[in-house]
Amino acid sequence: MIFWKNFFQNSNINASSEKNFKKLIVLDKTCDKIEFKDIYLSSNKNINLYELEQLCDSVGWVKRPLKKVKIALKNSSIIISLIQKKDANSKLVGFARATSDNGFNATIWDVVIHPDFQGLGLGKVVIHQLIQQLRQAEISTITLFAEPDVVSFYKKLGFIKDPDGVKGMFWYPR
């Protein structure tokens, strides 16, 4: 696909040597004050399922069986989480994952940012980190499914609807 070739050639996402946590500098400029948020990006696959469930609940997602969530996480190629550290406590404030055939294709799933942290650019950070890691693995096609109200967000990050007329198809049991 021509689009993806141009997208990745023109992408300004740079590789970095990431350890387990990478500190983000996040400014919250609401209410005429600037507040620094102590947020860390992690690619650690050990996610607390109950914290993830709380995060998903905070945005109104339908509850999913934890047993199946655990299986989905285990079978994910990449997991990115955002953790706020405050004093001795930590809180999961963002999450996304990708599955892949590890050759050509990957799909991004479960992108979620806690409502208190939306509008700070954290969703963009998570998506860019996923794309960066997938591109380092030489994945050439990255897909995702988006609710209608967030399509414009993904378009701003370079995703396109129906590239070259390609349509997603689904099969559901009857």
From Swiss-Prot:
The keyword Transferase applies. Keywords: Acyltransferase, Chloroplast, Plastid, Transferase. GO terms for cellular component: chloroplast. One of its GO terms (molecular function) is N-acetyltransferase activity. PANTHER family: ACYL-COA N-ACYLTRANSFERASE (PTHR43626), GCN5-RELATED N-ACETYLTRANSFERASE 2, CHLOROPLASTIC (PTHR43626:SF4). Belongs to the acetyltransferase family. Ycf52 subfamily. This is Uncharacterized N-acetyltransferase ycf52.
